């Protein structure tokens, strides 16, 4: 069997020396709504309204590389959309996963392109395929689907044959 999943407080206690946990808890104590440490990976569930500030804090703490931004549609559950950020510190040789949960009505979150410009295309892909808006994005437009495409094809409620 896998490792037992710990509560947020137990994760914080067992990883008290972790740079990411120290930095985020010091700067944004209310931003972390949950934490997991599973199979050697730290995941922090962040309140959506704090994502840009938390990313900036992690960058200042030495997490210098944004690996990707992805999305999961948990339809029909609410909150429906999980936006996930994988962030790496080359110096510390550590990775942290940030997750933010968004409701199905007008799913939106702040863009992190002011922190990591490389988020540009990742956020465009999530917008194009899932319909999640990124506030403050410099050019939020389709990247994979044609400009006249209707809807967002990776949503679980998207018609299999497309809109007709």
Which sequence ranges carry the predicted segments?
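Terminal low-complexity/charged segments
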Residues: 1-164
């Amino acid at each position: 069997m896998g490792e037992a999943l710990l509560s947020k407080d137990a994760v914080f206690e067992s990883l008290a020396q972790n740079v990411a946990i120290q930095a985020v808890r010091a700067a944004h104590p209310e931003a972390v709504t949950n934490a997991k440490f599973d199979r050697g990976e730290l995941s922090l569930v962040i309140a959506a309204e704090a994502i840009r500030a938390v990313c900036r804090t992690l960058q200042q703490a030495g997490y210098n590389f944004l690996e990707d931004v992805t999305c999961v549609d948990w339809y029909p559950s609410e909150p429906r959309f999980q936006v996930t950020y994988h962030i790496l510190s080359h110096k510390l040789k550590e990775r942290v996963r940030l997750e933010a949960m968004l409701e199905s009505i007008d799913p939106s979150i702040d863009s992190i392109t002011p922190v990591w410009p490389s988020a540009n295309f990742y956020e465009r892909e999530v917008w194009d395929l899932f319909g999640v808006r990124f506030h403050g994005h410099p050019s939020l437009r389709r990247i994979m689907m044609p400009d006249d495409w209707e809807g967002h094809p990776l949503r679980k409620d998207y018609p299999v044959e497309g809109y007709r």
